[in-house]
């Protein structure tokens, strides 16, 4: 009889905490939000300084392809570093003309939420 009670208590004891993966948090349904640009808009910069776009979450590097447009058209290197897009001219930025950078809405985070 004591063995039965002992076995019953062991079964109850080991079944108290149900084993399951953690629930996680709420599902990410918001796209990345542009937080800032360095250097500031309409500022004079060195001819070879990069332009850095900062977002509130990590950017999927594969979403950048054909999503950043630069006018006038110049050769640039575009890299993604965590939550930043770094645009650096391969030669130099144009001397006496403004540079316009347009972002397409195809830029997304790792959950494919677009900006």
Please place each PLM-identified region on the residue numbering.
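Acidic, low-complexity Ser/Thr/Gly/Pro-rich repeat segments typical of extracellular/periplasmic
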Residues: 16-115
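Sec-dependent N-terminal signal peptides
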Residues: 4-13
